[in-house]
Amino acid sequence: MMNNNGNQVSNLSNALRQVNIGNRNSNTTTDQSNINFEFSTGVNNNNNNNSSSNNNNVQNNNSGRNGSQNNDNENNIKNTLEQHRQQQQAFSDMSHVEYSRITKFFQEQPLEGYTLFSHRSAPNGFKVAIVLSELGFHYNTIFLDFNLGEHRAPEFVSVNPNARVPALIDHGMDNLSIWESGAILLHLVNKYYKETGNPLLWSDDLADQSQINAWLFFQTSGHAPMIGQALHFRYFHSQKIASAVERYTDEVRRVYGVVEMALAERREALVMELDTENAAAYSAGTTPMSQSRFFDYPVWLVGDKLTIADLAFVPWNNVVDRIGINIKIEFPEVYKWTKHMMRRPAVIKALRGE
């Protein structure tokens, strides 16, 4: 772990930029085969022009093709990271930095709605944006510039003492600050439930709430960190450590195996419940369950509806192919589940940074 606040999330953000998480795709709503939305709009034109090449280089890394291009890409990434480290060092003395944009915001912040502090390449920030959009809450997003050290601004550190994104200000609760993505999601659904009486993306049943919490904590503690570490050791660590790449990639696969099994069980229960005329044949194994007209119906981790337990996975599922995992082939239930969520208007809006 890095000692300086924000260095790890900064490196991951640059990592995601350099492996083509940077360009919004206007055709994402109609693409049925590729569920990858592009997060960042803040990359330069050179990165945009080379995005297709960079993406192909990453996908072909395991097969050994395009070796020289892969090496060039990795060298470019290392150079970018070195520049980033130098910038971080230059801004380490906070007395020499004027955070005018952040200071101005805190002097003129709105009185209603929410303010989300995020980064254009931070999956956890988009996780919060998705839930805000799904709940219909009015919010503004400030995408911090880590290269300028905005996450170290004293005003922002007062919102999140860990100096990382996401962080949220609830202006309707006397400018309450919430940090850590899981805590933010729980705050939002509980507030919506209290205000409307509708447990949207949540539940009014204590048992279901406990299960939602379990999956949410599993995502924040096991799913996201493992993908982040796999990305780091695959592309950005100063030394090539094959065992580290293998260890974290295998752990990501293990995590997806847990989710795949849970969704498959939900799928089987749904098909057996709805397709009663063929249930006996499915049970006997004489007819594959995949032939059921209900086989592509959406299933969710908890109960029979979409919750924050499901949505929390979306932005990270969206980048997992960068570590060589094809969820469409390896984890088909996870793929279908993610695809259903990625088609939702609120999810599309949030992932586009709108």
Swiss-Prot record:
GST N-terminal domain mapped to chain residues: 112-196
Family matches, as Gene3D superfamilies: 1.20.1050.10, Glutaredoxin (3.40.30.10)
Binding-site residues for glutathione, renumbered to this chain: N124, H151, R164, V165, E180, S181
Main subcellular location: cytoplasm
InterPro entries recorded: Glutathione-S-Trfase_C-like (IPR010987), Glutathione-S-Trfase_C_sf (IPR036282), Glutathione_S-Trfase (IPR040079), Glutathione_S-Trfase_N (IPR004045), GST_C (IPR004046), Thioredoxin-like_sf (IPR036249), Ure2 (IPR017298)
Chain residue ranges for the region called Prion domain (PrD): 2-89
Cross-referenced Pfam families: GST_C, GST_N
Subcellular location: Cytoplasm
Stretches assigned to the GST C-terminal domain: 205-354
GO CC terms of this entry: cytoplasm
Gene Ontology biological process terms, A to Z: negative regulation of transcription by transcription factor localization; nitrate assimilation; protein urmylation; regulation of nitrogen utilization
Miscellaneous comment text of the record: [URE3] is the prion form of URE2. [URE3] is the result of a conformational change of the cellular URE2 protein that becomes self-propagating and infectious. This conformational change generates a form of URE2 that assembles into amyloid fibrils. [URE3]-aggregates sequester soluble URE2, which then fails to retain GLN3 in the cytoplasm, resulting in GLN3 activation and consequently derepression of genes that are required for utilization of poor nirogen sources. [URE3] can be cured by GdnHCl and by deletion of the molecular chaperone HSP104, which is required for [URE3] propagation. Present with 7060 molecules/cell in log phase SD medium.
Protein's job: Plays an important role in nitrogen catabolite repression. Down-regulates the expression of many genes involved in nitrogen utilization by inhibiting the GATA transcriptional activators GLN3 and GAT1. Under good nitrogen conditions, binds to the phosphorylated forms of GLN3 and GAT1 and sequesters them in the cytoplasm, preventing transcription of genes expressed upon nitrogen limitation. Is also an atypical glutaredoxin without a catalytical cysteine residue. Has glutathione peroxidase and thiol:disulfide oxidoreductase activities in both native and fibrillar form.
Entry domain remark: The prion domain (PrD) is a Gln/Asn (Q/N)-rich domain, which is unstructured in its native, soluble form, and which forms a parallel in-register beta-sheet in its amyloid form.
Protein family per UniProt: Belongs to the GST superfamily.
Full protein name: Transcriptional regulator URE2
